[in-house]
UniProtKB/Swiss-Prot annotation:
Forms part of the ribosomal stalk which helps the ribosome interact with GTP-bound translation factors. It comes from the Bacteria. The gene is rplK. This is Large ribosomal subunit protein uL11. Keywords: Methylation, Ribonucleoprotein, Ribosomal protein, RNA-binding, rRNA-binding. One of its GO terms (cellular component) is cytosolic large ribosomal subunit. Belongs to the universal ribosomal protein uL11 family. GO terms for biological process: translation. One or more lysine residues are methylated. GO terms for molecular function: large ribosomal subunit rRNA binding; structural constituent of ribosome. Pfam families: Ribosomal_L11, Ribosomal_L11_N. Part of the ribosomal stalk of the 50S ribosomal subunit. Interacts with L10 and the large rRNA to form the base of the stalk. L10 forms an elongated spine to which L12 dimers bind in a sequential fashion forming a multimeric L10(L12)X complex.
Amino acid sequence: MAKKKAISWIKLQVPAAQAAPGAKIGQALGPHGVSGPQFVKEFNERTAKMDPGIVVPVIITVYSDKSFSFIVKTPPASILIKKTIGIESGSKKSNTDKVGTISKEKLMEIVKIKMPDLNAKSESAAFKIISGSARSMGVEVEK
């Protein structure tokens, strides 16, 4: 059997276990001939164990026969940080206005979640990446 040829890749950010075949997904998949409802069904099944509604990136590979496969990534660090400290959004002026504080322990929990998607070789390097994301949002990291 011949290997399928990938013709395009689509990147989306979709709420876990709550995807609906609406405009956002339809507009992204429609031009490639992919069935929106079929993707939504498979995506919701695969993300059922995640926190419902948390936004997760997904990379969809569309093949020449109009079939598809997809990879679900971990939620963005900013969303995990906001959820952990209970804020709606980061600071507009992160260098002067602080919106909250996060402990090193909580940040390490986020690092462990994000580790598969980061290009860091060690947890200490990943910690620096995630703490930088927190600081750029105006969240202070406890020393």
